[in-house]
Swiss-Prot record:
Keywords noted in UniProt: ATP-binding, Cell cycle, Cell division, Cell projection, Centromere, Chromosome, Cilium, Cilium biogenesis/degradation, Cytoplasm, Cytoskeleton, Flagellum, Kinetochore, Microtubule, Mitosis, Motor protein, Nucleotide-binding, Phosphoprotein
Domain Kinesin motor: 183-515
Post-translational modification: Phosphorylated by PLK.
Assembly, per entry: Interacts with PLK.
Effect of S280N: Increased length of flagellar axonemes, in particular of the caudal flagellar axoneme from the exit point to the tip. Thickened or stretched distal tips of the axonemes. Significant length elongation of all eight flagella
Localization terms from the record: Cytoplasm, Cytoskeleton; Cell projection, Cilium, Flagellum; Cytoplasm, Cytoskeleton, Flagellum basal body; Cytoplasm, Cytoskeleton, Flagellum axoneme
Phenotype of gene-disrupted mutants: Knockdown of expression by CRISPR interference (CRISPRi) system results in steady-state length increases in all four flagellar pairs. Simultaneous knockdown of kinesin-13 and the ventral disk median body protein (MBP) by the CRISPRi system has both longer caudal flagella and structurally defective ventral disk.
Region listing for Disordered, in residue ranges: 69-109, 122-161
Name this polypeptide is given: Kinesin-like protein KIN-13
Residue ranges with Low complexity bias: 82-92
InterPro entries on file: Kinesin-like_fam, Kinesin_motor_CS, Kinesin_motor_dom, Kinesin_motor_dom_sf, P-loop_NTPase, SAM, SAM/pointed_sf
Biased composition (Pro residues): 151-160
Species for this entry: Giardia intestinalis (strain ATCC 50803 / WB clone C6)
Polar residues bias locations: 69-81
Amino acid sequence: MSDLVYQWLESANLQQYYPAFEQQGITPQRFITITIQDYGALGIQALPDKQKLFRLITTLKSRENILEQQPSAPNTGATPQSVPSSHVSPHVAQGDRFVGDKQKQNDIQQAQDMSLYESYDGGYEPPYVSAQGSGPANGDDYVIPTIPYHPNAPNPPNPRGIPTVNRTVVPPVDLFLNQIQSRIRVVIRKRPINPKELSQNQRDVVTADGWNQVSIHEPKVKVDLTKYTDLHTFKFDHVFNEQSDNQEIYQYAAKPLIRSVFEGKNCTVFAYGQTGSGKSFTMMHKDNGIYVLACFDILEYLRVYNGSQGNNSKFLVPVVSFFEIYGGKLFDLLNNRQRLQALEDGKGNVQITGLTEKQISSVDAMLNLIDSGLTLRAVGATGANADSSRSHAILQIALKYTKSGKEYSRISFIDLAGSERASDVQNSDRQTRMEGAEINKSLLALKECIRAMDKSNDSKSGAHIPFRGSKLTMVLRDSFIGNSQTVMIANISPNDKSCDNTLNTLRYADRVKELQHGKGGIIKFNVLKMGQNAADVILGTARDDENDVYKAGIVGVNAAPSQQARVPPASQAPITARQIQQNLPQPHYNPNYNPPNSKPAFEPRVETTDEDDMVRTHCDLVDSIYEQEDLIVRAHRRQVDSMMQLVKEEVALLHAIENDQVSIDDWLVKLSDILSRKEEAITTLKGNLSAFKQALQKEEELSHSIDLNKARKK
């Protein structure tokens, strides 16, 4: 089996490290469990070699029964160092970025005929420059894969390669190359159903229908207890099914942004979704999270970029910062969670005072920083998840000029706090409810900023971007203006118990992307949003927007095509979602046709105006409570400082009267003045506390009213 380890290393041109592996007693079983932190102990220090080993191990992990698939090496008595070159190397999965030489890569291409490669020849070339590739132009062993052909490429022996070549998730080449130029891209990731959900007899109700469409088969029960399935269909830029891994997500969603960063653009990748849907796994996984994979490529691109610059003053260095937004406040995760302040300078730029920024030179250095920061991140239990992230974690990698320190560009990786329905947090304590309201408000503000950014991209005069709507959008202001690109990864859970949250996630993502309809890019499939947008209820702060036109269309088999709702021309006055609901035509009933598992007829949704108003009021009240909290904390600090000053004056006055340095009359006057000022400071603080207690009591009563309203509907 030691020959097998040598063959694996040889396939990646890492055979020179085999003695260290042999000395450490690395078996094939241990080989595939090696982590990045172990590379140093094995003598692997060079960044290109670390990349090769990382991709080799990831490839081997992705192939099922890798050890059983390998033929037993003949026992000829030869040492691993003397293994002849004629030994067959392990089959290299599609998309591997390590090859031995030009002939070896050509052999791989002939054997699989499913992957396009472009060469890395030391020049600064983008990874997606052409849909036609013919292998490396020289013998360099580092190549950057592009996307495979579709739909003509044959199915690989293992659909879990890197990247996964699943015919249901691979977009057309020409369309994908056009997509990555868009300022906004929205992709969906479906996680696998887990054993706990299966043990609870939960069903998978999410299907990825092709590379850009997802369907939700929502189980429902009518008033007469008749069960039926309501079908919801959405289309996005890309849909990843449960077989997709982080490598594939990064390859298609985030990697194109790396090129944009080196073009001077500010880029943002954020993961959104219900708690437990895989956001942190996608963004912050310590071995193959998107930020880890991006750091590999950023450092490699940076080496190439700096090598192409003749002037040292144009050299760039990566600088990392990591902070969280919790309860509307900023905390530095690289400095023991110290409080930060987001302030605007005279030019209108947002500056985060006190933020720790550390220059990195390797992936290991960044991993150590992030691991220490993640231990400080705020988590808590909700009705949706027992270990929910209650803060937005923002990791920023800025490229700065070496000499001047001026920022050239920046890429932000955002692991958003979990989005829950109002009912998921209403039965929790006040702190959890307030956290949920603040989270939902910031998520709504983020959506509105992205949509406004899209409007400004189409408008000659530009549209106002409401980045002051929350602390999240305020600190990300540079990502919403100027030359910027954004990718949203919406994570969804497949089980039927999370169906409501899954639908709300998709509706949120659909609202982010809906303005792309009718433009020169993707033509979206119009999907009916039933009645008042349910996402508005969940977010708790959305209001009827008279300037929005909800693109409506009935998804079902009983409505005739001519009777589907139409969007009015742009010249007509815009209408609201409620008006569309009222103006929908009556469904066409066919008594002789009742397909199975489909909704027999369209049932109008019961209006929930009172509940909507209460949820909105609750969110506004929570926002006011957070503002009052900051004011009271500052008032308390002023009161303490004032008391300390008065105590000093009182002690000095006491010494004076004891030493006969002041007359009794003067002592009485000064002491009376000190006590009056003490009483005034205490009275003022107590008044602030009384108003704050009333706001908390009102929040408690409003939350209880929402619970009662939901209980009556059940």
